[in-house]
From Swiss-Prot:
Subcellular location: Cytoplasm
Originating species: Chlamydia muridarum (strain MoPn / Nigg)
GO BP term (any one): DNA transposition
Keyword Plastid: no
GO CC annotation terms, alphabetical: cytoplasm
InterPro entries referenced in this protein's UniProt entry, alphabetically: CB, DNA_brk_join_enz, Integrase-like_cat_sf, Integrase_catalytic, Integrase_recombinase_N, Integrase_SAM-like_N, Recomb_XerD, Tyrosine_recombinase_XerC/XerD
Molecular-function GO terms, alphabetical: DNA binding; tyrosine-based site-specific recombinase activity
Keyword Cell division set for record: yes
Boundaries of every Core-binding (CB) domain copy: 6-89
One Pfam short name: Phage_integrase
Residues in Tyr recombinase domain copies: 108-293
Role played: Site-specific tyrosine recombinase, which acts by catalyzing the cutting and rejoining of the recombining DNA molecules. The XerC-XerD complex is essential to convert dimers of the bacterial chromosome into monomers to permit their segregation at cell division. It also contributes to the segregational stability of plasmids.
Protein name according to UniProt: Tyrosine recombinase XerD
Underlying gene: xerD
Length: 301
């Protein structure tokens, strides 16, 4: 284990405040950033801020390679470093920001569920034998909400009663930015059914709880629980590796396949950059090619 200098703890504490207050970054993301920065401070190691320079970046990258870390992991660590160096410069703790060139990382195209697989997944909770009616209806509403809106799992867990209207849900995304996302009639019906017939049963244990989706203890549903529920149902309907994010991918890709505008999809997904949304154009293209080879009589000619 590398030595933890007093400076490390001091910098991490200040960086945490910077990320949380100045940048408005979610707690789990703050934790991930700080873990990467602490690793940098320990691996080099950094004893004073004067040691944070271009050479320290090169040394850190070299040690990451020695640890046989993937390019994706290294890219994530360097993104964290770039934000950290900006914080240090802004706080006048360093005079010059070290230059960081991100390694080239191929974007892995997500595995996309077909519409048939999505339909099977959406219906699975109510078709699962011996499943408590509250759990089944709550999970059905969760699945429909994911697929109808494309929101992230953290955004779903943060939904409150006041965020839901007849046609839209108000979503609080990264950087605490809010956006309005339209919701389908069917998804709204599953939410209404859950709210009127089942949610109250567990809210009695915690009457002041305003979050939409509750655990059996009447508390806000945790991300880990949502992941477990989704993967449980997914294993019953497909051999693909499925997570809550898979429904976000399916939402975007199926919209593109039906000629939806890319900019509108970007807004609904809450992507800051259009490049993050453009990956779905490649997935949609692959889907079109696959259908061509499957159905066109002369595709192999």
């Amino acid at each position: 284990m590398s030595m933890l200098f007093p400076l490390h703890q001091q910098l991490i504490e200040q960086f945490t405040i910077f990320l949380s207050v100045d940048r408005g970054i979610a707690p789990l993301s703050v934790q991930a950033y700080c873990q990467d920065i602490l690793l940098f401070l320990q691996r080099v190691p950094i004893e004073t801020t004067d040691m944070i320079n271009q050479e320290s970046v090169f040394l850190f990258v070299e040690k990451c390679h020695q640890a046989k870390e993937s390019e994706t992991t290294l890219a994530r660590r360097l993104i964290a470093l770039k934000v950290f160096f900006h914080f240090l410069k802004d706080a006048k703790l360093i005079h010059q920001q070290p230059f960081i060139e991100h390694p080239k990382v191929w974007k892995r195209l997500p595995s996309i569920l077909s519409t048939e697989e999505v339909n099977s997944l959406l219906n699975q909770p109510l078709n699962t034998l011996n499943l408590d009616a509250y759990i089944a209806n709550r999970d059905t509403a969760i699945l429909y909400t994911f697929y109808a809106t494309g929101i992230r799992v953290s955004e779903l867990c943060d939904l409150c009663i006041g965020d839901i209207s007849d046609d839209f849900i108000r979503v609080t995304g990264k950087g605490r930015k809010t956006r309005l996302v339209p919701i389908s009639i069917k998804a709204r019906q599953t939410i209404d059914s859950y709210l009127t017939m089942f949610r109250e049963r567990f809210q009695k244990k915690n009457p002041s709880e305003e979050h939409v989706f509750l655990s059996i203890r009447g508390k806000k549903l945790e991300r880990s629980c949502v992941w477990k529920r989704i993967t449980f149902y997914a294993k019953l309907v497909t051999t693909k590796h499925i997570s809550p994010h898979s429904l976000r991918h399916a939402f975007a890709t199926h919209l593109l396949n039906n000629q939806a505008d890319l900019r509108i999809i970007q807004e609904m997904l809450g992507h800051a950059r259009i490049s993050s949304t453009e990956i779905y154009t490649h997935v949609a293209s692959e889907s079109i090619i696959e259908k061509f080879h499957t159905h066109h009589p002369r595709s192999s000619s």
